[in-house]
């Protein structure tokens, strides 16, 4: 269950901005996983992959402020939330390009909680221009995750991606692909979610990635198969990954975005000559304390698209109306209803997410 607790406001530290939250967005799959894990005796509930090793081995020098590194919360409770928008109320002295009063969007499961006030490192914060609704900007983390997954396919203009899963990320992926001139085929066992997709460039909506679905993929790709597949579902079934092998063209790429069964059919994999890659969260820099906590950027000539630049691009696409959030069904509810909202989302296939509100906003809500 989700519990709201009173906590002291965070203390502003070097490299951080203090933000008064106006909207935060629920990521149903990730957050339910964390909530469920708190009920397991002895379990550590966190979003980080191998936190003890991952953060320590990124750089030999380590972070200059180790107290900022995320720690797995104890059993019983876990802070959740990682995508929000709000107004800056204070900045650390070393922050030069963000000022109090600026409107920003923030990411990070170690800091951008469902909370009235958060302290977020500069590299996990992006400016939001006038004209972009705060509740749309609050999806910045989900947008960056979808952008990074799309990049990992390596697809370019005119190619075709099979997207398995028509949830929030799948919906965003279809819109991003269209904005990039890439065609999509979407598979989901939930017909309601397939009907919610309204991006142009969707060649086919498939109720399953079964034999008929795989045949349909080949039919709309001149018999070759999809250039890439993004698996954006949570399931224990191995049929998803093995079906994706059958749906790919020779030499295609599969991007593992969700959590799914990994008992691979070697014959299918070998026959497809497929490349299987992961997509790590919001982009390069994620889980790197030097980047995220010490705010040391990756030079653009070394890494064109970091997690912060992916976040900023999502906000830009919102401002240019290339991404439409109005058509994505979500609940818009006060934070005080969090527990009931998590339960409602779990049983409602037509609602992809929830936006928590925190009183007054710049839209006058």
Report residues per predicted region:
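Mid-domain Rossmann-like dinucleotide-binding core that forms the NAD(H)/NADP(H) cofactor-binding site
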Residues: 110, 133-211
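Residue-level marker of beta-strand positions
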Residues: 23, 102-103, 117, 160, ...
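C-terminal substrate-binding/catalytic core of Rossmann-like NAD(P)-dependent dehydrogenases/reductases
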Residues: 264-328
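A structural motif shared across PLP-dependent enzymes of the aminotransferase-like
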Residues: 108-121
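Glycine-rich beta-strand-centered segment in the early N-terminal region that forms part
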Residues: 10-25, 37-108
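C-terminal capping/lid region of NAD(P)-dependent oxidoreductase domains
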Residues: 223, 228, 255-258, 274, ...
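Residue-level recognition of short, solvent-exposed, well-ordered loop/turn junctions
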Residues: 13, 27, 99-100, 121, ...
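Glycine-rich cofactor phosphate-binding loops and adjacent beta1-alpha1 units
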Residues: 153-155, 195, 200, 204-279
